[in-house]
Amino acid sequence: MKSFSSGSLQTDPSNRKLCSCSIFHAAAFLCMVFVVGTSFVAFDYKEKMSAEIPTDAVEITRGNLQTDLSKLQTPRANSWSHESTQSKSCESPCISSGSEPLPKGIVMRKSDLEMVPLWGPPKAKESVSSQKSLLAIPVGIKQKEIVNKIVTKFASHDFTVMLFHYDGVVDEWKDLQWSEGALHISAINQTKWWFAKRFLHPDIVAPYRYIFLWDEDLEVQNFHPERYLSIVEREGLEISQPALDPAKSQIHHQITARLRKGHVHRRMYKFNGGGKCSKKSSSPPCTGWVEMMAPVFSRAAWRCAWHMIQNDLIYAWGLDMNLGYCAQGDRTKKVGVVDSEYIVHTGLPTLGGSDEKMGSSDLHAANHRFAVRRRSYVELEIFRNRWQKAMAEDKCWTNSYPEH
């Protein structure tokens, strides 16, 4: 029987393999023992720590944990709050309809009637002078002389001038000194109110302090625009007109006639006949009323009045009785007639007059004027009906003058 020697063990491959496996299993066993032992030690340590740490300390730890969690959540809450605040700040009632896709800084809501040169580098446009006002007149070439006198009075002051050419003649005005600086708009046989509705939008004339919307048949020898406006501002008039010289003018309503005492009057007195007016009267035409041949509006009053002008009612009859609603306050105080600056209303029959180029006879001209007058009365009735209907249907509107 052979003895078992160490040499033979080292040289036998099978024994070498057995030795390697034994070493591997031994190492694995030791690792398992170490892991399990460590777990028991850690568990035992936690148990001991739990026994040694007071309950209130545990609660504090939990509280700190909750506080830390709330801190982690705060940025998200603040983010929501910021988004909500930003959303509210972006809700602006002043955004112009149609401009929503544009950044606010590029939107120009208003404009003006000032002309800009065609040449030279573009410059930042200066705003219209805060003292500037607007004179707008419907004109025909036959009244060129009287219109020239009116505009000359205004052009020497801080006014922009706009002419509405209802006869289509524009070139024959070019010889007048002020013509090149005026705005000329031409549309055949259209009225002052037709032009005003379409070319004097409140956002276009907003830069101007006052809007003078005058007829062409006015004489202005005793009228000075600058003095007139100083009186209007001092008296707080939002809607006004210069008084008419009773000796030379066509007077349709007594309230427009000039009084020799004082600078302004706001009511008339009539004690006989129909339509009596006293100091207790609060409705037009006794008070709060001007005639439509030479009204003057503040920009705020015009913004209101423009909306009342009807697109299809080109003579605006009936509008005068309701202008007090646009007076920005008590119409018995905010509407008035300026006596110290007065004019003459000649009453020329311009609309529907004869057209020499067409060879119209005087009879035809008279017929045209009669047709104009008839349509004016029809428009008056239509406007009254619309006003009554609008008052009845608008449940959100409050009538400032229920006696009206």
Regions found by a protein language model. Name each.
Residues 164-210, 221-223, 271-272:
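Active-site-proximal specificity loops/subdomain of glycosyltransferases
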Residues 113-130, 142-161, 168-178:
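Short, acidic, metal-binding catalytic loop of nucleotide-sugar glycosyltransferases
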Residues 14-20, 219-336, 349-376, 380, ...:
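Conserved catalytic core of nucleotide-sugar-dependent glycosyltransferases
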